[in-house]
Amino acid sequence: MSRDIIKLDQIDVTFHQKKRTITAVKDVTIHIQEGDIYGIVGYSGAGKSTLVRVINLLQKPSAGKITIDDDVIFDGKVTLTAEQLRRKRQDIGMIFQHFNLMSQKTAEENVAFALKHSELSKEEKKAKVAKLLDLVGLADRAENYPSQLSGGQKQRVAIARALANDPKILISDESTSALDPKTTKQILALLQDLNQKLGLTVVLITHEMQIVKDIANRVAVMQDGHLIEEGSVLEIFSNPKQPLTQDFISTATGIDEAMVKIEKQEIVEHLSENSLLVQLKYAGASTDEPLLNELYKHYQVMANILYGNIEILDGTPVGELVVVLSGEKAALAGAQEAIRQAGVQLKVLKGVQ
């Protein structure tokens, strides 16, 4: 069983500006297990970046308790000496939207700068830098300056630099926001690869649920400084509870865009009185069941599929359908019950039940 490598308990962060007190984070508790890729999602101003900055005490909380790798580093106040905190911070790497590379130094020199206070010899440092650049796919770019690198390559240098002190945790704060979609996927694939190869715990801060869907195994949703929903990616995507979470997921799955087109179709605009427009969501074993065929066999209910999507989330197939069900009123009622009994979520979008 995995252990919690990050424990944030009842964290508050408040800022005082003249006569105003601003609460950026309010009573947030999050536990992240070793080896997780953990996404924290929210719109601008949700408090997600402020929250992750307390992990290494770049931002001191106003209240709460922080435990990192079994060491309590904050409990109402900082519990470490300055030297202990410096060493603990070496266990936590960070990458950002802006790469923060030194323009007058090569890729190799930028990574080596993170080893400035290391006890390694000059030769050992050089070998380590070469290994890190190879790990992020830049072995042939060691002597290039930032101006000679693409955005994705600059972020790879930043990742190599963040890994220089062998951290157990890597915080990615909107690290793909400035990148094009193709490069974003490449950087996410790299983070996933590092997670698997190094056993690295990755904390992703993002406003895009698509990023969480691509590589995370757990997700927390923040709004106005509060944690409003948390769970496995599979749980959250298959059964979101909060309206904001539902909005994020609709954007990530493309269902909203699809519904605009579906609603213009003749069969939907002029839905017959013996028909229902329904949305079906299913996960795991349910995706293997020939459910719609069974509806006709047992209830004489016809199913016209207008939209379908299936994805693999954290190793589990998750599907979504928009379907017109047609049949006698009693048969439609029986078919709906059969669908729910099969473990499939059903939502009537249009039609009289």
Swiss-Prot record:
Give the family per the record.
Belongs to the ABC transporter superfamily. Methionine importer (TC 3.A.1.24) family.
Task: List locations, semicolon-separated.
Answer: Cell membrane
Reaction(s) the record says it catalyses:
L-methionine(out) + ATP + H2O = L-methionine(in) + ADP + phosphate + H(+); D-methionine(out) + ATP + H2O = D-methionine(in) + ADP + phosphate + H(+)
Q: Which Pfam families match?
A: ABC_tran (PF00005), NIL (PF09383)
Gene name per UniProt: metN
Q: What is the lineage of its organism?
A: Bacteria, Bacillati, Bacillota, Bacilli, Lactobacillales
Record text on subunit structure and interactions: The complex is composed of two ATP-binding proteins (MetN), two transmembrane proteins (MetI) and a solute-binding protein (MetQ).
Q: What class of enzyme is it?
A: translocase
Q: Which SUPFAM superfamilies does the record cross-reference, listed alphabetically?
A: ACT-like (SSF55021), P-loop containing nucleoside triphosphate hydrolases (SSF52540)
Recall the GO molecular function terms of this protein's record. Answer: ABC-type D-methionine transporter activity; ATP binding; ATP hydrolysis activity
Q: What is its main location?
A: membrane
Domain called ABC transporter: residue spans: 8-249
- Keyword set for this entry? Amino-acid transport, ATP-binding, Cell membrane, Membrane, Nucleotide-binding, Translocase, Transport
Q: What is this protein called?
A: Methionine import ATP-binding protein MetN
Q: What Enzyme Commission number(s) appear in the record?
A: 7.4.2.11
What does this protein's UniProt record list under function? Part of the ABC transporter complex MetNIQ involved in methionine import. Responsible for energy coupling to the transport system.
This chain's source organism reads Streptococcus pneumoniae serotype 4 (strain ATCC BAA-334 / TIGR4)
Membrane topology, record value: Peripheral membrane protein
